[in-house]
């Protein structure tokens, strides 16, 4: 301040008075303070909502809240605008005790175990064994995994068996009720039939029990695993009919053959005699053989055919030289003994194209 009378100059230093109570209230309302007050102040190891084990380090980065408040008070009194908690020595320097070290080491083993690389392959579909899955396979005590005398985790075979059962329920095609988009335009519900894969659950349980603890499946590189089946199928996955199949529409008396999604053959047919209760059964079956120049025999008949494609027991697709007409409502009163009678020229085409194993979708 300038003195106009004596031409002298003086510097005035302001005096700062801190309202400690007000500062405390403001401090306690800070987000990091509230978070620190509710923070776990120890190591913790537990399964989260997804089911996998997670480790929380409550020791690292712990703040001495009282020390931090005093540092804040000093900062305000000195008219400073920023406070560095680290430079002010406001973090605890904590050395883990033996129990905490043991828990941290256990977590390292769990973390390695949970990083499983096994990926199930069901056709084009991929189904990884997740960290949560791995955690669910462990035998536990007080929420933590049990180890054997060699230090390895102990697996719960019942849990692994249940997991494989869930895979089978999801991906097995054999005996499944299917929704099929027909050529005539509607969606058909089809039950039964002989087609479809069936997982070998015993072998897959044994595979997981053997490999889950193998260090080779915890490398960080995905390893595709094609499961073992009791029954094989032409295609795998939930859509196991795929885009190559024979479709027999017994209401419209039509048969179609699709190959890789392309319609390769369409023909009228005659199916089982409905009046005589010999109607061709519905279901999703498959071509299990192919023969030429076969004589089909049954009670009271012996029918020679040039091309024979059986799809379910004694029921199959074949030419019928004794018929002059196909399609319409012939099957109602003059149908076959259960087979799909087909014009010879169309049957020859089908025989040359279709492979053993091809799904055959049969419905009314």
Residue ranges with predicted function:
Residues 1-302, 307, 354-356, 361-364:
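Surface-exposed, secretory/extracytoplasmic low-complexity segments enriched in Ser/Thr/Asn/Gly/Pro
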Residues 307-353, 358-362:
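Active-site scaffold segments
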């Amino acid at each position: 301040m300038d003195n106009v009378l004596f031409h002298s100059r003086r510097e005035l230093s302001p005096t700062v008075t801190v309202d400690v109570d007000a500062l405390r209230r403001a401090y306690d309302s800070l987000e990091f303070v509230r978070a620190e007050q509710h923070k776990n102040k120890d190591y913790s190891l537990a399964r989260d909502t997804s089911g996998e084990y997670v480790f929380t380090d409550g020791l690292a980065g712990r703040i001495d809240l009282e020390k931090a408040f005093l540092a804040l008070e000093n900062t305000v009194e000195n008219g400073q605008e920023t406070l560095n908690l680290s430079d002010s020595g406001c973090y605890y320097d904590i050395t883990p005790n033996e129990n905490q070290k043991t828990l941290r080491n256990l977590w390292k083993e769990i973390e390695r175990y949970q990083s499983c690389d096994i990926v199930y392959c069901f056709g084009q579909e991929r189904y990884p064994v997740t960290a949560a899955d791995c955690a669910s396979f462990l035998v536990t005590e007080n929420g933590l995994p049990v180890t054997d005398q060699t230090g390895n985790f102990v697996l719960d075979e019942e849990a692994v068996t249940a997991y494989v059962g869930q895979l089978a329920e999801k991906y097995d095609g054999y005996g499944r009720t299917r929704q099929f988009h027909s050529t005539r335009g509607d969606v058909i519900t089809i039950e039964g039939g002989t087609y479809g894969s069936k997982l070998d659950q015993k072998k897959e349980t044994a595979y997981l029990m053997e490999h889950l603890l193998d260090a080779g499946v915890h490398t960080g590189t995905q390893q595709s695993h094609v499961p073992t089946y009791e029954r094989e199928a032409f295609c795998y996955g939930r859509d196991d009919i795929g885009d190559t199949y024979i479709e027999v529409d017994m209401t419209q008396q039509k048969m179609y053959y699709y190959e890789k999604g392309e319609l390769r053959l369409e023909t009228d047919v005659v199916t089982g005699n409905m009046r005589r209760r010999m109607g061709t059964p519905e279901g999703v079956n498959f071509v299990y053989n192919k023969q030429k120049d076969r004589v089909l025999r049954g009670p009271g008949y012996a029918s020679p055919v040039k091309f024979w494609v059986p799809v379910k027991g004694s029921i199959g697709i074949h030419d019928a030289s004794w018929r002059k007409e196909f399609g319409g409502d012939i099957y109602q009163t003059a149908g076959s003994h259960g087979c799909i009678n087909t014009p010879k020229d169309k049957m020859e085409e089908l025989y040359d194209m279709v492979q053993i194993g091809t799904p055959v979708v049969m419905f009314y």
